[in-house]
């Protein structure tokens, strides 16, 4: 019997990369492994994929150094850019590339005393309005970076705000702005993340940046299997009790659920202390012994309760799947009103991790 455990499949991870390559056969891949590889384990994911991708994308310098210290030699890109001028010498000696999106960063690079020049990606705001230089500033920043001795190479990066809305023309508007801004300029380009890879073929360009689809999860509320993807993460726990329960009796804090029949209640060893969302409504499914059973009562810190039915054969120690291939995380996300991204990255350190082939 095991407590809450995530099982991470290297086979599924490699399979998903092959699907991504089929979607964008002419693009190089920057695999996004920020936030501990979306909760999958950055060391495991980066080492598994090093020979299958062309580089890695992270949000923070500490994440980049974690990947590098794991023996990975491929380029690493800071997707938010560096936070302090003191970071630049570290980037220089560790083959870490950086986004530049403001004047302070440009000034810091020009002033820095670096052992090796660094590769820079100029972030262009094409409509996300979060990070990036304006379209009118692109020529200025590009020329300044190209003439800076501390810069080895300049690329271009932007980000779609509505790539998961396949009926919106805003993605095409952003793409055309990006293409116009980088026209006749030397440098690789990347604008497509997961949504762009799946739904906007013209956006693939020289590099793509797969994130959530790499982990076998759809960026929209359609099961990833529709795109040939396989979930890399399966969240499981165990039944720690199977109890007879009388009709009319409540279950859990507040007694908000009352059984309408004699039944058997199962107790699963997982709760919001493990990162399972407290706000899941009654009826949210858990997969046990080949069938879905509904959560009843409130999720507590360490346990959830399920209605196993009066004729169940389940026993203590049986595995319960909270999400995975048998129960898509996209479905759990839709029920809870959360994003799949949130569910995966909110799991707490006490959840055990098993890496499987």
From Swiss-Prot:
Q: Which CDD domains match?
A: PLPDE_III_AR_proteobact
Q: Which SUPFAM superfamilies match?
A: Alanine racemase C-terminal domain-like, PLP-binding barrel
Annotated pathway: Amino-acid biosynthesis; D-alanine biosynthesis; D-alanine from L-alanine: step 1/1
Q: What EC designation does it have?
A: 5.1.1.1
Q: Which reaction does it catalyse?
A: L-alanine = D-alanine
Class of this enzyme: isomerase
GO process terms (BP):
D-alanine biosynthetic process
**Residues with PTM N6-(pyridoxal phosphate)lysine:** 34
Question: Which GO molecular function terms does the record list?
Answer: alanine racemase activity; pyridoxal phosphate binding
Chain segments annotated as transmembrane: none
The protein's matches in Gene3D superfamilies, at most eight in alphabetical order, are given as: Alanine racemase, Lyase, Ornithine Decarboxylase, Chain A, domain 1
What domain of life is recorded for the organism?
Answer: Bacteria
Cofactors required: pyridoxal 5'-phosphate
Pfam annotation, one family? Ala_racemase_C
Keywords assigned by UniProt, alphabetized: Isomerase, Pyridoxal phosphate
Q: What protein family does this chain belong to?
A: Belongs to the alanine racemase family.
Q: What does this protein do?
A: Catalyzes the interconversion of L-alanine and D-alanine. May also act on other amino acids.
The name on file for this protein is Alanine racemase
Organism, as annotated: Mannheimia succiniciproducens (strain KCTC 0769BP / MBEL55E)
Q: Which gene name does the record give? A: alr
